[in-house]
Amino acid sequence: MATKEWDSIDKTQYKFEDYYCAFLDMLGYKEKMNLFFQNKFNLYGRVQRAMRGAGVEPTPQETPDGIVTRIFSDSIILTAKKSEVHIEVMLNYVAQLTAWFGYEGLFLRGGISCGKLLEDFGYEEGFSFLASEGLVKAYQMETQAIYPMIVVDNDIVSHIDNSECVIKNGNKYILN
């Protein structure tokens, strides 16, 4: 049985802010990874070149445009504070990334949403932590997409000024 002292950790209160969050999945990653380890496809080099081409800062840090990018295995996660980054900047960023990965033969499918977020980059504790409502929604949207596409959450479509950024595809909005 836990003591009151042990359970006191649950009294900690955090300040959550709304963030845009994109979850992108590299399609066919397992095959590309197998070729990489056979020295037949430079997966690492192609990912690096696509990231540089799109102007992405590859490490979790404050960036000039306010968008933080994390990449691991076949997943790319982008976050941006809603109060500081306009949704169209985020959409353009994802579009650039998607195009550059496509040039490398690495096709992306994903989702973009918004929600509360807490992140600790691990500077003090030595490990990082990310909890995001928007990430969960973006991941769920990605799993429902059939083809390489970036699905945009219906809840944020009304915040988009440039109607050419997204198009309606069936019952979903997708990045154009």
Residue ranges and their predicted role:
Residues 80-176:
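Catalytic beta-strand-to-alpha-helix segment of the class III nucleotidyl cyclase homology domain
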